[in-house]
């Protein structure tokens, strides 16, 4: 074997050895960190939700509620977290005094769990007229009252019903939209 060929073989073996060594290393903390978020109280690590899935029943309920009331309504999203997705099976009514629901504000009397709803993965409320459907003021990182409210809740997601779509947010404070019409 010629000297040039031996040199190429040594380089190839060294490269394979380094590749194998790197493959055995644990994942970068930065990469792992980006897939997890802190809970509302800042003590627990929870997976970042990247997808919100509404059942047909939940979509129908939201459409009916939105059309039925000139004031904000609030519901408890009942379901489960599956990996990086939250699956909402149904929307249960939140415990709200009628006098605590106006066209621009809704305040529950008690938490979803205290009202008897187990399996709550988030809270959803409406914005009649589909206005101001955001968790941050446009072009800023300044949280609206909805963003501030979500930050103090323990749930992985929060949502705003805005006519033909739902605006929602996850623990990473990333705001997303979901059409109300089921994707077929």
What residue spans do the PLM features occupy?
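Compositionally biased, intrinsically disordered low-complexity regions used as flexible
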Residues: 1-2, 113
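Hydrophobic alpha-helical targeting segments used for export or membrane insertion
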Residues: 14-18, 22
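N-terminal Sec-pathway targeting helices
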Residues: 2-15
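Conserved beta-strand-loop surface patch within small alpha/beta domains used
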Residues: 21-120, 129-184
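Mature extracytoplasmic domains of secretory-pathway proteins
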Residues: 122-124
